Swiss-Prot record:
InterPro entries: KOW, Rib_uL2_dom2, Ribosomal_uL24, Ribosomal_uL24_CS, Ribosomal_uL24_KOW, Translation_prot_SH3-like_sf. GO terms for cellular component: ribonucleoprotein complex; ribosome. This is Large ribosomal subunit protein uL24. Keywords: Ribonucleoprotein, Ribosomal protein, RNA-binding, rRNA-binding. It comes from Chloroflexus aurantiacus (strain ATCC 29364 / DSM 637 / Y-400-fl). One of two assembly initiator proteins, it binds directly to the 5'-end of the 23S rRNA, where it nucleates assembly of the 50S subunit. One of its GO terms (biological process) is translation. GO terms for molecular function: rRNA binding; structural constituent of ribosome.
Length: 110
């Protein structure tokens, strides 16, 4: 996936198009992400015991990962990302793979 938990993203499609948020959870098995404050749905919940009453609760539903675009931390624009290998190696001796911004060519992953 082109985004990770904690990334700042811009929603580019759907009812929340144009809004920004931070990724709370990434679900790579189904290619979806949960974004803070975006795609709010109302859930009708039955009571689940003495400490958890029922009612209508609002929660964030997952969005498809293709409907969000990463906001580059260095240039501040929503841009496409790519992956490249660095000269330095990881703990197993392989070249380190990082994401980079295609607009400003800056490395996103530290």
């Amino acid at each position: 996936m082109h985004v990770k938990t904690g990334d700042e993203v811009l929603v580019i499609a759907g009812k929340d198009k144009g809004r920004r948020g931070k990724i709370k959870r990434a679900l790579p098995a189904v290619n979806r992400v949960v974004v803070e404050g975006i795609n709010i749905v109302k859930r009708h919940q039955k009571p689940r015991g003495p400490g958890r009453p029922g009612g209508i609760i609002e929660m964030e539903a997952p969005l498809h990962a293709s409907n969000v675009m990463l906001i580059c931390p260095s240039c501040g624009r929503a841009s496409r990302t790519g992956k490249r290998f660095l000269e330095e190696t990881d703990h197993k001796g392989r070249p380190r793979k990082v994401r980079y911004c295609k607009a400003c060519d800056a490395v996103i992953d530290k």
